[in-house]
From Swiss-Prot:
The lineage of its organism: Bacteria, Bacillati, Actinomycetota, Actinomycetes, Micrococcales. PANTHER family: IMIDAZOLE GLYCEROL PHOSPHATE SYNTHASE HISHF, IMIDAZOLE GLYCEROL PHOSPHATE SYNTHASE SUBUNIT HISF/H IGP SYNTHASE SUBUNIT HISF/H. It holds the Pfam family His_biosynth. This is Imidazole glycerol phosphate synthase subunit HisF. Heterodimer of HisH and HisF.
């Protein structure tokens, strides 16, 4: 791998608090986002991702004040998502201190928004979040066996997740945040098949998310094609040096880390 693997803690925020659940359900309080952001910055995180997990499903804006306070505490790139619908929200997030914006539900509903945002700000600003799950029994199967979900994993779309990643890359997204809804919060490891399929379909960087439970889970995701690895529970509820442990595991597997 030509560039160093990035390790990214994820702050899933609901009503101004960091939360974590399993398969996006049963949310548990994990702390104050500003305090956690400061801790992860000091602990060696390469970037932070801040997702307002109910902004899209509740049809409300991201909590911009929390974004601003978080951005004031960290000196590493901050990606913010949740409730991003177009150029106006991205512009506001950047003014409040975000470095990149993540979009999911709005892009599925209107793919042209990807072109509009990247034309306005450049590809490097836009991350496409793909919440993918294996197609359910009784539902129409997709070609890859994975479908795109929206509204924080609550709604299936019937859209093939691999084809959607390919289309978004062709439209100009800078990165793909690939989250396995099936693995999310389970601590059983990343969905390696999903990562491999998307890696074969796109050339843009992939951030693998969903399922990390111990440092040993991270190297297989990198080997499958992830350029960065993202997790929440393992960092929120694990020892304070967990970022360092994860980087050590990746390095010992033969991959470069920052």
């Amino acid at each position: 791998m030509a560039v160093a693997v990035r390790v990214i803690p994820c702050l899933d925020v609901d009503a101004g608090r960091v939360v974590k659940g399993i398969n996006f359900e049963g949310l548990r309080d994990a702390g104050d986002p500003v305090e956690l952001a400061h801790r992860y910055d000091n602990g060696g995180a390469d970037e932070l991702t801040f997702l307002d997990v109910t902004a899209s499903s509740g049809n409300r804006e991201t909590t911009f004040d929390v974004v601003r306070r978080t951005a004031e505490e960290v000196f590493i790139p901050l990606t913010v998502g949740g409730g991003v619908r177009g150029v106006a929200e991205v512009d506001k997030l950047l003014r409040y201190g975000a470095d990149k914006a993540s979009i999911n539900t709005a892009a599925v509903a209107r793919p042209d928004v990807i072109d509009e945002i990247t034309r306005h700000f450049g590809s490097q600003v836009l991350v496409l979040s793909v919440d993918a799950r294996r197609t359910r029994p009784g539902s129409e199967p997709t070609a890859s066996g994975f479908e795109v979900t929206t509204h924080g994993g609550r709604q299936g779309t019937g859209i093939d997740a691999i084809e959607w990643a390919r289309e978004a890359a062709d439209r100009g997204v800078g990165e793909i945040l690939l989250n396995s809804i099936d693995a999310d919060g389970t601590k059983d490891g990343f969905d390696i098949e999903l990562i491999r399929l998307v890696r074969a379909a796109v050339r843009v960087p992939i951030i693998a998310s969903g399922g990390a439970g111990k440092p040993e889970h991270f190297p297989p995701a990198v080997a499958a094609g992830a350029d960065a690895v993202l997790a929440a529970s393992i960092f929120h509820f694990g020892p304070v040096d967990m970022i360092s442990q994860v980087k050590t595991a990746i390095r010992e597997a033969g991959f470069e880390v920052r």
